[in-house]
Amino acid sequence: MSLASSIAALAARIGFEVKTKIDATHPGLARVWVSFGYVGGQVVIASARNVASVVRTAAGRYRVHFAVAMPDANYCWTALARSSTNSGQQRVAVIRASSGLKTAKYVDISCATTATSFDDSSEINLVVYR
């Protein structure tokens, strides 16, 4: 067997093993992801997986509804927000400690400036793991 044939056989075997061990329920895979922004007075979803809708509840505050609910609210999420201006002002994606909600059906996220005021962003990227 040539080296090329051996490598091809090994690659096929690795692919088979990975495929049998990692499926859609694997905890390392994102259950939800979305890239959206507030542009022209409306929420625009650029791309998404398992997202039914994104609703702007107030300036800089959004509710992301899942198309298929999580089993519970014991998931983790991470998000990044882009500055809507070109002046070096940063945006931070956060959850409010007092009234931000995280349920099996949706998660509330907020976009804030470094001056701690809520503000919209033209691009927010959210990923949810469970």
Language-model segment annotations:
Residues 71-101:
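Terminal beta-strand-rich extracellular "head" domains
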Residues 2-72, 104-130:
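Extracellular receptor-binding modules and their adjoining Ser/Thr/Gly/Asp/Asn-rich linkers
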